[in-house]
């Protein structure tokens, strides 16, 4: 970079026709369009019009002449105002005038005789010369703008040098004030230039340089003041020199970006996706070969070499200190699986070459039908590399979860030692702080290595570079404070560097979060919290206060990070049911679970730290710890609610079948048993496969009914329509009850099933009340009777679910044997038939019949059958009851809408003023404001271009060259 006294050098060739700003492009585009249109006149051959009388050509020629005149007027004005490029601009204006006159003459001659190839060729050459002249004029005008910016930079450089040469604090304050004024002017001019730059990389460089200038300007004053106040402390000079260097580099960055010069090698090092991700992408592309041209001698060594380089990178990650033992074993296992899959694939290629099993048509596409052994081997190879990617991502997330936890603690400890004036401790803690910073940079680079997000990787690497350069200066500020602990200036300097460090760490953290998957983060965080919970319990039992306190702090930090990241993630979505459920889960963890956990930790530490052992309820602590784990897991379940099966396939911690059926009305979940024990749900999960298959058949029928309800409620906006809201609630509860029969879902015990049945009955009663109000207002007797009949069905099937749930409650696990209490079942069975008889008697014969009686009244429930058959009968009854109720709800929703339309049809607008429920069509399904992109899509995504084709002048000129033959 030039010094303060060096002349301004424009790194720009005036003869170059490269367009670097959007303004020049937009100004040139109309002229290019007009000239191109004129040149292409009658390009399709002779027309039916009279020769030599093309009115359109004359109009186009006149428009070109007018556009040229406008450029001349603006060019002359710019030339008068410019000081540095005055001669060049005047020369360019004269050239445009000369070429414009030539173009006017040749275009007029061509317009008179558009079929003449000679006149057309002459006009093409004139058009090319005119476009070149206008382009050069605009580029020179653009260079004049850059010169004005460089002049501002020169003034700022001189002001910076003046600040550096200040001799006392008063002089510094005066000079810094002048520097600040020039900074404001420079920022305004640079911002305008940034918006005009055509190259997005140059815009990014300009934005980064402006940000660095603003950031370091705040540190410039305190660092200079500390140096003037304490010149005998070497650390103050290091601080000041660092800040001055950063400001100078920022000024140079603005100058380079403004002129759109090539980036330096350092900046080029920041570009591109991660090395390991790129290697895996390349390997995945290389394994798909043409079997007819496959050569083992040619392809085997290169593929094996590429794979071994990938495995070497994976091994380095596996051997890192923060990688868990189980994760290391999984990475090693996946590496071995990938090796074996490659050998199997190469063998299949050899077999295809040897036996020639590929058909000609298949060879053209490069693939055979799905069942072909080679395709199977390719798919297996791809799956294994995908599995390896997943384990590497989880390993990286292990590092991130551990390293980006309580990132401010080493800094706070360092500052506290500096405030006490203990230079020895400061040096010791400085080493800890330096190791912490190095770890952040190392982990950030690891995250980059496996990421396909090119822009995100660039941001992370730049932020990591800033962290690396800022770390020594934070230590210098601490050393200054330690040497002069009573100095207000040293304290202010420390505060400024502290704030800057914290901001930079936040930038790095957010950048790392952007290139990692929130699903991976939640999965790893959940596992880490479970590890820490177990460590806490062990420390509590062993009376290890330090470990308990430290591990509990880690749990609080992990939970806080989960809450922060998920809240930020939800800002990418429009508000709706999905975001509401996720935010409710985070709110519960933040406001209820974590305060209770912190309270229990405090009680435990006080009890263990007391000289005389204090009584402490260990189970309360374990329950509070378990709730933290459950809270994080609930957040994860809520986040995964909208994931597709393909996205969930990469999450090995969740079984695919738990998410096969997802809709707007239900959320399916699973549960881990942290505490060993046989709940009713666990018993259901242990049924023989034959019994599970029968239950699955019933569940499939239930899902068909559920799909009908989904389709019906999806039509309507539930705001102002409690019937739709209740239908969704009932569907969700019924899904949980059917999940229970498969050993899944949130319902764990028979008491949970009974409570769920009660909730359904309550919702059914509320729906009955609303729908009867609709029926009362319906003037059509047939519609009214239909609706009432469907409501009677709901009452019947709600009662049926109550009975089936109570039957399950009578199944007791006594000494490992299940016993069915026949008396209780008989009483509920009798009560049910009394209700069913009343319902059928009160309904329309066309709507209800004895065939609808619930299956839970079958005699199998009274027998003393085996344990498995009893459980099967009970589960089947529960599912069928839910299916029948689901069907009744669907019919009720439809009938309620029909009845409402009849009412409005008869009473007109008066009905709209006081409707029981509001029937409005639902708006299109909400989508994320920011599209979630899979990591593998970053390289293959295609951005849609502008609808309007932009023809660059250079391209237009090259096209004209091809026309010279005319």
From Swiss-Prot:
It holds the Pfam family Vinculin. Residues 924-952 are annotated as: Disordered. Residues 941-951 have a biased composition (Basic residues). GO terms for cellular component: actin cytoskeleton; adherens junction; axon; cytoplasm; nucleus; plasma membrane. GO terms for molecular function: actin filament binding; cadherin binding; structural molecule activity. GO terms for biological process: axonogenesis; brain morphogenesis; cell-cell adhesion; dendrite morphogenesis; regulation of synapse structural plasticity. Transmembrane segments: none annotated. Residues 924-940 have a biased composition (Basic and acidic residues). Belongs to the vinculin/alpha-catenin family. This is Catenin alpha-2. It comes from Xenopus tropicalis (Western clawed frog).
């Amino acid at each position: 970079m030039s010094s303060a006294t060096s002349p301004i050098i424009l790194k720009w060739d005036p003869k170059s026709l490269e367009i670097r700003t959007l303004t020049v492009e937009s100004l040139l585009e109309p002229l290019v369009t007009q000239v191109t249109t004129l040149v292409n006149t009658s390009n399709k051959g002779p027309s039916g019009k009279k020769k030599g009388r093309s009115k359109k050509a004359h109009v186009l020629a006149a428009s070109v002449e007018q556009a040229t005149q406008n450029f001349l007027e603006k060019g002359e004005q710019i030339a008068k105002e410019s000081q540095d490029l005055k001669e060049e601009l005047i020369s360019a204006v004269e050239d445009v005038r000369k070429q414009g006159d030539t173009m006017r003459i040749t275009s007029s001659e061509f317009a008179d005789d558009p079929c003449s190839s000679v006149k057309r060729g002459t006009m093409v050459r004139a058009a090319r010369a005119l476009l070149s002249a206008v382009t050069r004029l605009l580029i020179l005008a653009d260079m004049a703008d850059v010169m004005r910016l460089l002049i501002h930079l020169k003034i700022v450089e001189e002001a910076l040098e003046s600040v550096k040469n200040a001799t006392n604090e008063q002089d510094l304050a005066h000079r810094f004030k002048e520097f600040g004024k020039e900074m404001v002017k420079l920022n305004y001019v640079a911002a305008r230039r940034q918006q005009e730059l055509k190259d997005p990389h140059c815009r990014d460089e300009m934005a980064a340089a402006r940000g660095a200038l603003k950031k370091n300007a705040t540190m410039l004053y305190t660092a200079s003041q500390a140096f003037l106040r304490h010149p005998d402390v070497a650390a103050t000079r290091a601080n000041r020199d660092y800040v001055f260097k950063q400001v100078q580099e920022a000024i140079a960055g603005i100058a380079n970006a403004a002129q759109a010069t090539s980036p330096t090698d350092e900046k080029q090092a920041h570009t591109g996706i991660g090395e390991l991700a790129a290697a895996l992408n390349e390997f995945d592309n290389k394994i798909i070969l043409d079997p007819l041209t496959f050569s083992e001698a040619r392809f085997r060594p290169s593929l094996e070499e590429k794979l071994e380089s990938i495995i070497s990178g994976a091994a380095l990650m596996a051997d890192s200190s923060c990688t868990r033992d189980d994760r290391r074993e999984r990475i090693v296992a996946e590496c071995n699986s990938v090796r074996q899959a490659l050998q199997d694939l190469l063998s299949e290629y050899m077999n295809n070459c040897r036996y020639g099993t590929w058909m000609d048509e298949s060879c053209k596409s490069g693939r055979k039908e799905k069942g072909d052994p080679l395709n199977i081997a390719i798919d297996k190879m791809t799956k294994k590399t995908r599995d390896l990617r997943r384990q590497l991502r989880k390993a990286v997330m292990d590092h991130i979860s551990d390293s980006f936890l309580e990132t401010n603690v080493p800094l706070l400890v360092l500052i506290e030692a500096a405030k006490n004036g203990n230079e020895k401790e400061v040096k010791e803690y400085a080493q800890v702080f330096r190791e912490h910073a190095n770890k952040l940079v190392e982990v950030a680079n690891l995250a980059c290595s496996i990421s396909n997000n090119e822009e995100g990787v660039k941001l992370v690497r730049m932020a990591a570079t800033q962290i690396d350069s800022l770390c020594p200066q934070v230590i210098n500020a601490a050393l200054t404070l330690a040497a002069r602990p009573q100095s207000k200036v040293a304290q202010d300097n420390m505060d400024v560097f502290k704030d800057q460090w914290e901001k930079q760490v936040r930038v790095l953290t957010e950048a790392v979060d952007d290139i990692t998957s929130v699903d991976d983060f939640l999965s790893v965080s959940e596992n880490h919290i479970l590890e820490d919970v177990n460590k806490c319990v062990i420390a509590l039992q062993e009376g290890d206060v330090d470990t308990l306190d430290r591990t509990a702090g880690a749990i609080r930090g992990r939970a806080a990070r989960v809450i922060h990241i998920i809240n930020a993630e939800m800002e990418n979505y429009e508000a709706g049911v999905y975001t509401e459920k996720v935010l409710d889960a985070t709110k519960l963890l933040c406001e209820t679970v974590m305060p209770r956990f912190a309270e229990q930790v405090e009680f435990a530490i006080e009890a263990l730290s007391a000289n005389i052992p204090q009584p402490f309820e260990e189970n309360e602590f374990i329950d509070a710890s378990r709730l933290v784990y459950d809270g994080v897991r609930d957040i994860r379940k809520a986040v995964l609610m909208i994931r597709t099966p393909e996205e969930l396939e990469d999450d090995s911690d969740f079984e695919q079948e738990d998410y096969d059926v997802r809709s707007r009305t239900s959320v399916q979940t699973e549960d881990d048993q942290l505490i060993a024990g046989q709940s009713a749900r666990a018993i259901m999960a242990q049924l023989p496969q034959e019994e599970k298959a029968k239950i699955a058949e019933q569940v499939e029928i239930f899902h068909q009914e559920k799909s009908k309800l989904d389709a019906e409620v999806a039509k309507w906006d539930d705001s102002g329509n409690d019937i739709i809201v209740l239908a969704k609630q009932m569907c969700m509860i019924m899904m949980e009850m059917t999940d229970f029969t498969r050993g899944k879902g949130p319902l764990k015990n028979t008491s949970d099933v009974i409570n769920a049945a009660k909730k359904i009955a309550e919702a059914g009663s509320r729906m009955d009340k609303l729908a009867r109000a609709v029926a009362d207002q319906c003037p059509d007797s047939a519609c009214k009777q239909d609706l009432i009949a469907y409501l009677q069905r709901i009452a019947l099937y709600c009662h049926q679910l109550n009975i089936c749930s109570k039957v399950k409650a009578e199944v007791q696990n006594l000494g490992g044997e299940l016993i069915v209490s026949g008396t209780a079942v008989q009483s509920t069975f009798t009560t049910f038939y009394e209700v069913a008889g009343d319902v059928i008697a009160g309904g329309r014969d066309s709507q209800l019949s004895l065939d609808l009686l619930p299956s839970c009244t079958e005699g199998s429930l009274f027998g003393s059958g085996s344990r498995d058959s009893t459980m099967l009968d009970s589960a089947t009854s529960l599912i069928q009851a839910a299916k029948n109720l689901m069907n009744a709800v669907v019919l009720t929703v439809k009938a309620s809408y029909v009845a409402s339309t009849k009412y409005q049809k008869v009473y007109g607008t008066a009905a709209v003023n006081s409707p029981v429920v509001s029937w409005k069509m639902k708006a299109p399904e909400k989508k994320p404001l920011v599209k979630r992109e899979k990591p593998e899509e970053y390289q293959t995504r295609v951005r849609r271009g502008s609808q309007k084709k932009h023809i660059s002048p250079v391209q237009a000129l090259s096209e004209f060259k091809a026309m010279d033959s005319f």
